[in-house]
Curated annotation (Swiss-Prot):
Belongs to the spermadhesin family. The modification N-acetylalanine is found at residue 1. GO terms for cellular component: extracellular region. This is Carbohydrate-binding protein AQN-1. One of its GO terms (molecular function) is heparin binding. It comes from Sus scrofa. Keywords: Acetylation, Disulfide bond, Fertilization, Heparin-binding, Secreted.
Amino acid sequence: AQNKGPHKCGGVLRNYSGRISTYEGPKTDCIWTILAKPGSRVFVAIPYLNLACGKEYVEVQDGLPGAGNYGKLCSGIGLTYQSSSNALSIKYSRTAGHSASSFDIYYYGDS
């Protein structure tokens, strides 16, 4: 069950909207790439983020993995991001041995 739905570690997400949630499996790095229709943009909202700073972080990247990013985030309220193209990537990373904190990241594309 760990590899299904919003709790999966990474992957390409093509649905119009959805949610990315805490991955609690053994991997320490997860990268999700959200792809909207060509000409559309991707919007991401993180209502509440409270990770263990220094041990884990979320990174929002404007485009495909490795694109310019908005910095490493470990806490915040009401965070929103918008891509400049039809792709946006989200990376979650934690140090080995540290249990993942819970988080929910919501995304949608403009149509």
